[in-house]
Amino acid sequence: MKLDLFVYNSQHFVNNITLYQLNHLNSTSFSFIFLSGLFTSLSPCIISILPVCILYIAGETQKLNPINKTKNLFLFCLGTISSFITLGILATLITKTYSQFFNGIPTISAVVIIYMGLNLLNIVHINSPKFNGLVTNNNYNFKMYLSGVGIGIAISSCSTPIFVTLLVWINSTQKIFTGLIFILIYSIGYIFPIIIGSIFSTSFLKLTESLSGIIMAPSVELCY
């Protein structure tokens, strides 16, 4: 079985178990939601973007001191989690056809990832005086948070099946507070590889390069 087909089938299997857990809430439901987020993150979609996230958090030179790296990681993850929660609230309030709501996100994802890559290469910058002043005055914190928001929007399209299941459950049960806690836990599990990768940035970047090569190989073969 090809890797991409295995990942697809596995995600749908986890999605079915998640739906069962949501309909039969117990003490293990919260931990399973975290594990479902973690499992969903182990896909080519997330692995391919990990190096960009790690470079933003740990710095291009990998020489940030532990305090600054921890601060960057916190702000980046805060931005990512807040984007997930915001998307969940908007999708629940605006529409019940969640697939239509997420249709435009892949395009937004591509734009965000391309911009962040070009920004890391110092090719593209935002030349707004107000934006630059805001970033400078807050010692880079706002830019790090905003980067997390952008990545959160970008990777949300990779988590559609289980994320939509959570949104449908929230809408059908009207347990909004519990649902938001589930989205919070799910998003933490979903970005857990980014957290681990940032802590062990040097070793993790080498690992993701190897994994990206293995994952991209079947796609290259299809071109011939």
From Swiss-Prot:
Keyword Transmembrane helix applies: yes
A single BP term in Gene Ontology: cytochrome complex assembly
Cellular component per GO, a single term: chloroplast membrane
Chief location category: plastid
Membrane topology (UniProt): Multi-pass membrane protein
PANTHER family, per the entry: CYTOCHROME C-TYPE BIOGENESIS CCDA-LIKE CHLOROPLASTIC PROTEIN, CYTOCHROME C-TYPE BIOGENESIS PROTEIN HI_1454-RELATED
Role: Could be involved in cytochrome c synthesis.
The family this protein is said to belong to: Belongs to the DsbD family.
Annotated protein name in UniProt: Putative cytochrome c-type biogenesis protein DbsD-like
